[in-house]
Regions:
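Cell-envelope and extracellular/periplasmic
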Residues: 62-386
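Tandem repeat scaffolds
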Residues: 1-63
């Protein structure tokens, strides 16, 4: 298996008895029923690997249960510092776990000297197999290094790269918030990431949770923001085509669970804002009814988050002069100081912007991204002086 990329591979029941797995990256691999007993897994990366029924007796390994993940971006706070969560499961005895970051360039090469080692966890119970901690780090793009010691002796080490501290956005709504653009987009900046059920990854379309298989504005927006602020950008896009605002309410369907899933991934204060682009399917609804439902959704998301999550709301209908929806969206923006104006995509109608009258062509995706960029720039000017 030398040189074979095993990430995400289905290895169910495979005979790996003669395979040297030291240092292999098995991120997301299915190892169900694989006998790994007695194997040396030092340096082996088992992030989000399926280990159901896997025999790990007497192995030497490190398995982060939740994070950090490669390409993961954590939200910086107003002081530019973000908290990188670190957790894992140990199959061998350690009494000290330390971490440090190494600044890296866009190509992954070292950009500066490593930062100082910091204690993540001092194991007081030698029988414990799980640990958790965090590392406070300034805005940037890094390789995370972990080392494990016992009685003052280094016994294992591992590195995870890349990870970032920057800006994170949750995205919800209907098809124009999802993967309905005419062409898939790919970021030109390696610091633009997205999250899906298999973890964080480079943010090429299609976005992994949102509906559809085409393109979105988010890789383009990520490039704009990464260039403007010189930092990593993370997205979690959970949009679903054809949905009405009522369907996103927690009392209606399971659509709200998608927002909850994103909130659980980022954690408290873990996203700059939720970006909402929806309204095409609600043409004909009374203005006041739309206002009440969108406000209910925003409040429900904040209750679930446990903090005052900002929202960005686009002005969007079906391009047929249905001003009641746009006026309703504007009313929600005006009534809540933590809701900011997103782009008015009703200004982008016709074949110049949309390939089928509804969904964006290449020009439309570019302008949609530019609209969110302008809105977010205004938001960040109010929060962070840069």
């Amino acid at each position: 298996l030398s040189g074979v990329d095993l990430r995400g591979k289905d290895l169910t029941g495979a005979d790996l008895s003669g395979v040297d797995l030291r240092g292999k990256d098995l991120t997301g691999a299915n190892l169900t029923g694989v006998d790994l007993s007695g194997k040396d897994l030092r340096g082996t990366i088992l992030f989000r690997a399926n280990l159901s029924g896997t025999d790990l007796r007497s192995t030497i390994h490190f398995t982060p249960d939740t994070s950090p993940d490669t390409h993961q971006v954590v939200q910086r706070q107003a002081d530019g510092i973000g908290s990188i969560p670190i957790s894992g499961t140990l199959a061998s005895s350690y009494d000290l776990i330390e971490a440090r970051t190494v600044p890296i360039d866009l190509d992954g090469s070292d950009a500066d000297e490593p930062n100082q080692w910091t204690t993540v966890n001092a194991m007081t119970d030698s029988t414990s197999t799980k640990f958790s901690g965090s590392l406070e780090e300034s805005t940037g793009w890094y390789r995370l290094e972990l080392r494990f010691s016992m009685n003052g002796n280094l016994v294992n080490s591992i590195s995870i790269s890349p990870i970032g501290v920057g800006e994170v956005f949750i995205i919800a709504g209907q098809s124009n918030s999802a993967n309905a653009g005419i062409q898939r987009q790919t970021p030109s900046d390696s610091r633009v990431s997205t999250w899906g059920k298999r973890g964080w990854q480079f943010a090429s379309d299609p976005q992994p949770i949102a509906s559809g298989e085409k393109g979105s504005p988010w890789p383009l927006l990520g490039d704009l923001l990464a260039t403007r602020y010189d930092m990593p950008i993370g997205f979690i896009s959970v949009g679903l085509g054809g949905t009405k605002v009522e369907q996103w309410l927690p009392r209606s369907t399971d659509k709200f669970d998608r927002i909850v899933m994103a909130l659980n991934e980022v954690g408290p204060q873990g996203a700059r804002a939720l970006l909402w682009h929806q309204g095409e399917s609600d043409v004909g609804i009374e203005k006041e009814k739309y206002i009440l439902m969108l406000k209910e959704l925003i409040n429900a998301s904040r209750i679930e988050a446990g903090w005052e999550l900002p929202w960005g709301v686009a002005r969007a209908s079906d391009c047929l002069n249905k001003v009641s929806i746009v006026n309703a969206q504007q009313s929600v923006i005006d009534d809540d100081p933590l809701v900011f104006e997103g782009p008015n995509t009703d200004e982008m109608c016709g074949s110049e912007w949309r390939y089928d009258g509804v969904h964006f062509n290449e020009n439309g995706l570019t302008e949609h991204a530019r609209g969110w960029y302008n809105a977010i720039t205004v938001l960040l000017q109010q929060i962070i002086k840069k």
